[in-house]
Structure formats: structure tokens, C-alpha cells
């Protein structure tokens, strides 16, 4: 039995029916990892011994349910007690936390089994995993292409069948963009819906914990577990967390769906525009009302983001100085040189670039011209979304302007690389929930459709995504590693 092909809820059913054990699942997945990991390069750290021990312990209890006995992966910026957390950086290459992130702790308490920590762009700053200090991950649909970023290791592992789901973070599209490139589902909840405690911070007003999985039902199931108020995270929201799975079978008939003209411009490839418009017609067939709208300030989201996010990163990363933890240069003659040399050796070029951008934007004489202006743009973007949501239930757009690009193709073209997040960044700037689901293939590569919802209305978002999924077969397409598809 190819257990690696199954979703979380399918594994649940087989565990409850007594057809398989948790140990069977874990062994099957590690066999799969042994087969494809040399190409995928998705994992930074594997936890085979502890995963097998955990599975056997759960099997002895002979009591399954929820995610009990089901394996998962973590983007390697979630702190894991006793397990290395590197952020894909030389700065934290040997850092072993003494505490567990809230989100992973909630999964562990429900019986989830951690298989390993997954690759990312260093400190989540990138769109391809090529900024990892260790190695780039690869796209299972074509090993010569990127899986996206910064959560590319998570997306590659899920798409390749190495894990059924993963937790990751999304600051400007870091869950949705790789989900689109790898043909899986990627959910970024509303800002504050899930605790960020124990997750290494990039941009604190934009970061959000989310999920990568093979289908929408799995996202709904996992979100119910990890969502909610956390006393350790002041930015987590004290709002009701519904049973998201209960909403999935609702009708979309009469639902009002908007598509913004600004998200279908010439810099989005024609094949992707065509694919998403075809997907919108599927919603119309299901009884939804689809209309064009305008989000006029979204075109300014990317430049504003690259002021706000680096500004916050420059303050968040100031803590890495070689004193309490992280890489330390022992050759320095004084403490100032030690700070400077430790950071020079510990941080990669993209992280340094963003620290310098952020420090400049916050510096005396430039704060008003850059940071303050960017925050004003951010408010205008949020206002545009609010106006549309007065009359519509959902907004639909492409997730990315192109399909996955080749490794090395954009590494020296920073502006083009940043443009990969042009359609996802506005959602983070407004703090809204967004999900990417597969909606087509373009020359054998997955195309993602992005659904955007009202704040804290993930239920409607998931219902619409599930309706599309149940009336199409794109989520059932899986890659034959290296090229081609299994239908």
C-alpha cells in the first residue's frame, strides 16, 4: 500500500479502521524520503528515531482520532525543543532551542509526529529556497526548477509524498507561492489567527503561521487544531475558532466572487490568466456570481512591502550578535568587531541586503520619506479590500504571475525575483486570509489560484476552495518526480 500518497483524513480513516498502524505510516514515509530526498533536498534535519518511537508509543495506546499517529513536517524556523532550528542560516546552524513553538506544541499534544525540519530561504527571505545557506530545494514536477519560497522545502516535501502536511510561515506569499509552484494547497490564515510564539520573526506585523497540504479538507482539519488565542503571543486574536470541516460541504450558490483587474495584468502570463478565468467560470457553473472589481492601490503593495518588511527585519535580526546564541567570531579583538564579524559570517547576502534596506528606511531623515509613506500605502491597500468585501464574499486571482522558474534563472535578477510575490503580498499587507489551490497545468507545471477572504472568515474561504476542488481533478494530479504526472 502506497501510504505516502494519502491525505491526512485518508490516513485517519485507515487508522480508525485498524487497517494500518502509525508505525506503518512513519516507515512508509521514511522509505519514500530515502527514495526521493536526494533530488528533492527538502529536509534540513530528519527525526527518524524519535518519530518511530513516537509512533510505537501511540500504537500501544490503540486509540486513534484527529491527527493522532499522523506525521508532519515543520519549516525550520519553528523552535523545536531539543531539535536543531537553523532558519537555514549559518548564524543558527547549531542552535538547539530549549522550548517548543506554540503551533508545533499543539500538534504534538494531539498526537502528531514530527518527521523533520524543512528547508527555506534564510530567515524566510526569498522566493525560491536558493537563499538557503545550505542547499536549494527542488520542485518534484521538474527537478531543474525551484519549488518556490520561502517555504519551498515544505512544498517540495508535500508534493513529493515525503510528508502529508507541513506547518510554515507566510510573510509575503511564502506559503501560497510554493503551493502554487508545486501543485498543492497552501493556506495563510488571518493575521493573529494562529500564534507566532516560538517562530523566528522576519517581519512581525506580516508573519503568519499556516499550512501546506494535499487538499483543502486537511487544511481545515489542521487549522482547527492550531488556531486560537495564545497568552504567549500578544498579537494572537481572541476570536472564536469554528469547526472548519463542518463548513466544507456548504453550497457556493449565490456566493459573490470578485476578481480584481489589477491582478490580471500583462505581467501575468497569458496562460495563467486564461486558467484562472476558466476556474472562475467553474464557480459560475456552481451558482456563484462573478464580477470584475478594482483594487487600485495593490500595484503599490510590493514597493511598500519592501520598505515595511526589511524595516521590521532589521530590528528583529539585531538580536543575532553572537553573544547569547548563534555564530560567534572568536578572533575579534573587541566586542564591536565581534558583533560585526559574527554577523558578516553568519548572514547570507539576501539577509544582509534586507537589513541594510530596513536600517536605511528607518534612519533619521528618511523615516517619513520611506517607512511612514509605506505604512500609509498599507492602509490604502487594506481600505481597498474592505470596500470590495462590503459587496463580495471572496476575491479570486492568480497566485503567481508565472509557473515555477528554473534554478539559477533569477538568482541575479533581484527585481524579477521579488515580482514573484506581487499577487500575494497585498494579502499580507491587509492582514487577510488567503489560500492557493491548484487550478490547471501549464506545459506540465502546476498553476495556482488564490482565494482571498474577509478577516477571520477562513470558513467561507475553505468552503469555496473545497467546492472547486470537489468539482475538478487538479488536486488529484501528483508529479512523477523529475517530470510528468500521475493521474
From Swiss-Prot:
Keyword Cell membrane, does the record have it? no
User: One GO molecular function term?
Assistant: glutaminyl-tRNA synthase (glutamine-hydrolyzing) activity
Q: What's one GO-annotated cellular component?
A: glutamyl-tRNA(Gln) amidotransferase complex
Alphabetized, the UniProt keywords read:
ATP-binding, Ligase, Nucleotide-binding, Protein biosynthesis
Instruction: Give the catalysed reaction(s), semicolon-separated.
Output: L-glutamyl-tRNA(Gln) + L-glutamine + ATP + H2O = L-glutaminyl-tRNA(Gln) + L-glutamate + ADP + phosphate + H(+)
What's its EC? 6.3.5.7
Show the Pfam families listed in the entry: Amidase (PF01425)
Q: What class of enzyme is it?
A: ligase
- Give the annotated active site: 75, 150, 174
Q: Which GO terms describe its biological process?
A: translation
**Similarity remark:** Belongs to the amidase family. GatA subfamily.
Share what the entry says about its subunit structure, partners included.
Heterotrimer of A, B and C subunits.
What the entry lists under NCBIfam families is as follows: gatA
Q: What does this protein do?
A: Allows the formation of correctly charged Gln-tRNA(Gln) through the transamidation of misacylated Glu-tRNA(Gln) in organisms which lack glutaminyl-tRNA synthetase. The reaction takes place in the presence of glutamine and ATP through an activated gamma-phospho-Glu-tRNA(Gln).
Q: What is this protein called?
A: Glutamyl-tRNA(Gln) amidotransferase subunit A
Q: Write the gene name.
A: gatA
